[in-house]
Amino acid sequence: MSKKFAHTQEELEKLSLKELENLAASMREKIIQVVSKNGGHLSSNLGAVELSIAMHLVFDAKKDPFIFDVSHQSYTHKLLSGKEEIFDTLRQINGLSGYTKPSEGDYFVAGHSSTSISLAVGACKAIALKGEKRIPVALIGDGALSAGMVYEALNELGDSKFPCVILLNDNEMSISKPIGAISKYLSQAMATQFYQSFKKRIAKMLDILPNSATYMAKRFEESFKLITPGLLFEELGLEYIGPIDGHNLGEIISALKQAKAIQKPCVIHAQTVKGKGYALAEGKHAKWHGVGAFDIDSGESVKKNDAKKSATEIFSKNLLDLASKYENIVGVTAAMPSGTGLDKLIEKYPNRFWDVAIAEQHAVTSMAAMAKEGFKPFIAIYSTFLQRAYDQVIHDCAIMNLNVVFAMDRAGIVGEDGETHQGVFDLSFLAPLPNFTLLAPRDEQMMHNIMEYAYLHQGPIAFRYPRGSFILDEEFNPCEIKFGKAQWLVKNSSEIAFLGYGQGVAKAWQVLRALQEMNNNANLIDLIFAKPLDEELLCELAKKSKIWFIFSENVKIGGIESLINNFLQKYDLHVKVISFEYEDKFIEHGKTSEVEKNLEKDINSLLTKVLKFHH
């Protein structure tokens, strides 16, 4: 099999169908090989190989906008576009991104779901205004159709009549099991040939029948369409082709050529198998969606077993315990049941915990109503995805001052997924909201205490915790959580103080321990609360320590530094504040330890900076 992956449209057109199939097989082999070493989105990419090849053959990637929703299906596109030589660096520091990025030659950035059709609509408008003959092509998975933004875009696209192709990759899975009426609707797809030939027969019959018979025939056609997969799209004004076999290159190429010739908005419904070509992944739901390094033969993870439980596992276990204790606890996740650990609760309490698919806005507002009715909702969500429901957080939770708990997973640097997934903004966008209380645990025991407190707390409350395990290796005595109270972990006469928040406490402790080995010292405070701050403790601290270092995994702007400076100004206190929070730029992908070193946020870099102020 050929190992040359980069192909122009002209080169692909010269290949026979058999050669294209061989190319697809080689692509799969390469993707499996690289992802097994680097980790990545495996099953979704394996399921979209033929779709991507056909896109590149029928359309011109140099001029036609190729838009990959979420870009979990973009690896084949990267290989076809000339990234073969650097594909081995996928998701590595300073290497190829696992998502689409304009800086790598892609049309648009993607990492969050359900944006592709809106982008296609905008591209259509721009192309029309410029008088150009280009056709946007959007590849979107069936899971993304659970988000409302898709229908906002389809509604306008169908009315616009711009040339545009929506390639719907229907693997009936999304990340976890499919959720909602739309998924069930697509799964009822009928055979393309039968549906298309039926439409043609009806059209011919309507031309020759008298008026009364024509009316009856139209009613019959409308009734038939109620059980066909194209109804949804056709009623929105889009042409519909399918369902087709998404692994049959001949079928896909033919459908794309047909859609291109229509010169109207067209949806091609392609049915695929997630994980196609790797037997261990075929037909699996969440397990092979996003993976770490693994052994190809056995499918077993090659990651060293970490004896420490992940923060997600701790959250899941604590919530199970709380839910068994308090029957008014309910919860929701937006298409991430296994990622957030809510799958265990959905399994045990299916009438109290729900996965609402990719619908963060709906998730938040629906839980607001449950809080209004006297329940205690826990919303389990990645920090980066809470951004998608910001208006609902303000309008439906904060203003109403409802008893809603936001459990923000993947806070801080998340590593290989890069800019679109780093959880470094939540403190900045939640802290300004009246009625909100913000906390972060430093370790497992404090996570337990904070969750107990969150249940009893009145008003909206959010706590953040990291991807992976808590890294604090010192067992400080846990404290009872009291509203707005911090904990003084290391107390001495040093003029230097370390203020840690969440995972930042562990970093502060590591730097402090290194200082102590040099016969130096510093005070160590676990803020516990970012809002409200413990003003009493901080006023006492300001009397003795005049240099404060902030350890927090959030951006500086709107982060702990901003909150501390507001406090100091309020009481006219004169303290020098040095923040080790993140600068005003997006953080790229790579292993967390390597990213931190690049940002000079590793322990050695932090220690060097602290020593400049130590006398």
UniProtKB/Swiss-Prot annotation:
SUPFAM superfamilies linked: Thiamin diphosphate-binding fold (THDP-binding), TK C-terminal domain-like
Superkingdom of source: Bacteria
Classification via InterPro entries: Dxylulose-5-P_synthase (IPR005477), THDP-binding (IPR029061), Transketo_C/PFOR_II (IPR009014), Transketolase-like_Pyr-bd (IPR005475), Transketolase_BS (IPR020826), Transketolase_C (IPR033248), Transketolase_CS (IPR049557)
Cofactor(s) listed: Mg(2+); thiamine diphosphate
Biological process annotations from GO: 1-deoxy-D-xylulose 5-phosphate biosynthetic process; isopentenyl diphosphate biosynthetic process, methylerythritol 4-phosphate pathway; terpenoid biosynthetic process; thiamine biosynthetic process
GO MF terms, alphabetically ordered: 1-deoxy-D-xylulose-5-phosphate synthase activity; magnesium ion binding; thiamine pyrophosphate binding
PROSITE patterns tied to this protein: TRANSKETOLASE_1, TRANSKETOLASE_2
GO cellular component, one term: cytosol
Catalytic activity: D-glyceraldehyde 3-phosphate + pyruvate + H(+) = 1-deoxy-D-xylulose 5-phosphate + CO2
Keyword Magnesium among UniProt keywords: yes
Function of the protein: Catalyzes the acyloin condensation reaction between C atoms 2 and 3 of pyruvate and glyceraldehyde 3-phosphate to yield 1-deoxy-D-xylulose-5-phosphate (DXP).
Record's protein name: 1-deoxy-D-xylulose-5-phosphate synthase
Gene it is expressed from: dxs
